[in-house]
């Protein structure tokens, strides 16, 4: 709904994966708690990023905002490398390692869970955008920001929520990829 291509999206994925990894490995939290705290962290991270860095860019040429997201990508990538290093770190074992046989095809549990999580997110997004007030507000804002604002929709709030959702979904992807491949 912000009409901005986020070139730092991949780094959101990395940040989410590393935050969850740190909560599990360094703080010794159980997976479910570390995962929920990671999602909460990324939600706040997305809102703060939009409010502090991107909101001042409203009204600027779109290329300036795109260049800003490229700069954020470089900044986040360098920060992650500086904090966590360049080496792959294995994620603690979350799902059983054995495979499940589905119609003669052996599928690892982690891949199956990633697929199920993806389906749940898709269904959740469908319901959110179709039936919730905020989902409808986001659709209206994406269609026409001025009309949405004239209807009483807080465009700034919609933008902040869009970036928060983007960060949360990226964190989910980062954690599921990290479980399978490790974090690097």
Protein language model regions, located:
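Alpha-helical transmembrane segments of polytopic integral membrane proteins
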Residues: 1, 20, 45-51, 72, ...
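Single transmembrane alpha-helix segments in multi-pass membrane proteins
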Residues: 1-25, 48-64, 139, 157
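Glycine-rich phosphate-binding loops of nucleotide-dependent enzymes
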Residues: 4-7, 42, 104, 144
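Alpha-helical transmembrane segments in multi-pass membrane proteins
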Residues: 12, 16-20, 34, 38, ...
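Interfacial loop-to-helix junctions that mark the boundaries of transmembrane helices
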Residues: 27-36, 58-60, 101-114, 182-184
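Alpha-helical transmembrane segments within multi-pass membrane transporters and channels
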Residues: 29-72, 79
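Extracellular/periplasmic helix-loop junction at the C-terminal end of a transmembrane helix
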Residues: 70, 74-103
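Helix-loop-helix "hairpin" substructures at the membrane interface of multi-pass membrane proteins
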Residues: 106-184
């Amino acid at each position: 709904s912000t009409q901005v291509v986020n070139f730092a999206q991949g780094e959101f994925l990395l940040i989410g994966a590393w935050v969850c990894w740190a909560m599990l490995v360094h703080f010794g939290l159980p997976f479910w708690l570390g995962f929920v705290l990671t999602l909460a962290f990324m939600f706040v991270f997305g809102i703060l990023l939009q409010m502090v860095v991107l909101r001042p860019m409203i009204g600027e040429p779109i290329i300036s905002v795109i260049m800003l997201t490229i700069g954020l990508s470089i900044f986040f990538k360098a920060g992650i490398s500086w904090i966590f290093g360049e080496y792959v770190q294995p994620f603690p074992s979350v799902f059983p390692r054995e495979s499940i046989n589905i119609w003669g095809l052996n599928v690892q549990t982690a891949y199956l869970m990633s697929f199920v999580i993806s389906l749940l997110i898709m269904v959740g997004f469908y319901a959110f955008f179709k039936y919730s007030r905020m989902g409808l507000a986001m659709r209206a804002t994406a269609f026409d920001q001025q009309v949405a604002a004239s209807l009483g929709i807080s465009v700034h709030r919609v933008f902040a929520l869009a970036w928060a959702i983007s960060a949360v979904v990226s964190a989910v992807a980062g954690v599921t990829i990290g479980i399978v491949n490790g974090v690097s």
